[in-house]
């Protein structure tokens, strides 16, 4: 990294950046380096600064990066909306208070195709929104079901990589409901690539974000 400007300005910029690196380590939450639409999660282990070899009024910073999961990730998200009456009628909107605002009109719900352009199956996050009871989703023959009741403004998050299932109550309380997953087919089964058939009863909405992983990002 090369910093330009007056000496005091360069010092301030390096201090600010170092504070960000230190915060990631202290909170045990990796930061992200982006290349186009891909990112890799990492920590900055060490920093060295020196006078730039291009101009002596610039400062170079050399950083040592540690990637606990050394894969570049591109996220692909699709929302699956509930059918208001269960008969494919048009409905107006659902408004959730946690930045997942629905505002749409749509015909039948319950079966959708989703094309995932990748060379392998992918880990995912799945967010299931209430109100609903024992939500069940079929993806290419695999069953993803949680035996739990969700009220309005509650939702469940499934993380296939971390193997976690968390319920968020309307008041912001988080509950670990791992033990409420269905047995048999795994709710953590990776989602295959290609033309994917997704089926459910159409009575609730959910989002799926697949994590398309590569050892190096695609050249954009």
Where are these regions (language model features)?
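Charged, amphipathic alpha-helical segments and their flanking helix caps
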Residues: 14-25, 77-89
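Solvent-exposed residues in well-ordered beta-strands and their adjoining turns
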Residues: 2-6, 66-70, 129
């Amino acid at each position: 990294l090369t910093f330009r400007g007056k000496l005091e300005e360069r010092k301030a910029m390096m201090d600010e950046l170092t504070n960000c690196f230190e915060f990631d380590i202290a909170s045990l939450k990796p930061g992200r380096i982006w290349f186009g639409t891909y990112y890799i999660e990492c920590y900055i282990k060490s920093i060295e600064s020196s006078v730039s070899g291009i101009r002596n009024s610039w400062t170079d910073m050399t950083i040592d990066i540690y990637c606990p999961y050394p894969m570049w990730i591109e996220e692909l998200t699709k929302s699956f909306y509930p059918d208001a009456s269960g008969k494919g009628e048009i409905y107006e909107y659902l408004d959730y208070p946690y930045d997942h605002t629905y505002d749409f009109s749509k015909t039948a719900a319950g079966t959708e195709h989703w094309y995932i352009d990748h060379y392998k199956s992918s880990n995912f996050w799945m967010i299931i929104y209430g109100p609903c009871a024992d939500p069940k989703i079929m993806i290419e023959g695999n069953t993803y079901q949680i035996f739990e009741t969700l009220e309005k403004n509650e939702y469940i998050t499934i993380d296939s990589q971390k193997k976690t299932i968390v319920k968020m109550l309307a008041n912001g309380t988080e509950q670990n409901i791992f033990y409420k997953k269905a047995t048999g087919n795994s709710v953590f089964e990776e989602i295959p690539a290609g033309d994917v058939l997704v089926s459910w009863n159409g009575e609730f909405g959910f989002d799926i974000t697949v994590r398309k992983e590569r050892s190096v990002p695609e050249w954009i």
